[in-house]
Amino acid sequence: MLKNSHVCIIIWLFGFISGFNIMITGNTLNYWFAKKDIALQTIGILSFITLPYSINFLLAPVFDTVQIKCLNKILGHRLSWICLTSTTLISLTSILSFLDPGTDLVLLSFIAFIISFFSATQDTILSALRTEIVPKELLGFTSGIYIFGYRVGMLLASSGAIYLSIYLTFNKIYQIFACVIFVYLILLILVSRYTNSVDVIEENTSYFYVARCYTMEEMHLKNEFFIKHYFNFFKNCISAYLLKIFSGSHVYRNDISLAYFIVLILIFLVLYRLPDNLINVMINPFLLHLGYNAFEIASVCKFCGVIGAIIGGLIGGIIMKYKNMLYSILLFGIIHALSHILFILLEVNGKNSLILFITIGIESITGGMTMTAYIAFISSLCQGKFRATQYSLLSSMMGISRSIFPIISGYMVVNFGWQNFFLFTTIITIPSLLILLKIQTKL
């Protein structure tokens, strides 16, 4: 059995690398593009690079069943997959470090997309391994450890990288990224001797038994299995998922149809986070446009932004203890939408460190509050023993909002200007709140 201290170290490492990897192809790459004066329209379109994070749940059955025989005997089922994905990430990040967005944009974007795919893949595997090695009584505590590691990883790969760009080129920084992933892999292998994760997933925790449609023998078929059964599995799995979410609820028995209700929920999940996701893609070009340097962006926008989000999460959690969830979602959504008006004030006044600090502080705190309510809402929709699958599918809507719709953000800025862009991010919150009022009586 794992000792509690070993569990904490391993879970912290899991969180660290997840947060670190998402920044490699996320905000840090976005900042590099902006510094290279890549067109705003192009920067917006390249938000699709993070799309694999939206659909990583589709690959979960593969990593539950397929074994890497050459590594499985040495490291075990999960760790062998982690070793493979980490090695691939090291190689791809090293290749990316020799490219230049100014001259190799297409190739660099393609490699970044593949990096994002393997990062999302690793997240899925780490999540599965985390559920296997953490005792039930430590789930709450280790979740905090995981989030702490995640935030540290994000800070180092975003704020830390932008600060380093004062002294180093981004090519050198991405070489450092590859070295960090290598060190992480070595550390994880060293502590892996403490793990006791199983090689074959038990029936009651297997992804495939969510839909109850295949036997263990069928699950271990190789190429023939994936060709014949992969999509059938997901059809059955999603059907079981939808039935389980709403079985026994007011929704399932009321005049509003199940399909219509589900569509409304999915639209809400996309629209509620859309303003933040539009801004996140354009925030680096906006700050550079105003004349802020790398140090100011790293310290105020990135570092203080993360701290503000943490504080906002705590405030949101406290408020939700005394107010019901739907009231909190509505209240936080309105407050956060109004905070976007501060970006217009910043654009009107030009470079002003005090206004920047106030804007980022308020936007981050209210953003942390909305995120807390958002996650709580998703969790409330998940019922029964299929919660993991339900949560993965619902949370993928957040990823779609982050990866697909922000494609238009660059075009909006170029054609309508920064002030109208931020005004739009304020107004676009209204449809999501109207949908919330529509569905609240059915929840």
From Swiss-Prot:
One of its GO terms (cellular component) is plasma membrane. It is found in: Cell inner membrane. The keyword Transmembrane helix applies. The keyword Acetylation does not apply. InterPro entries: AmpG_permease/AT-1, MFS, MFS_dom, MFS_trans_sf. SUPFAM superfamilies: MFS general substrate transporter. The chain crosses the membrane at residues 6-26, 43-63, 74-96, 106-128, 144-164, 172-192, 255-275, 300-320, 326-346, 355-375, 394-414, 416-436. GO terms for molecular function: transmembrane transporter activity. It is a multi-pass membrane protein. Belongs to the major facilitator superfamily. This is Putative transporter AmpG 1. It comes from Rickettsia typhi (strain ATCC VR-144 / Wilmington).
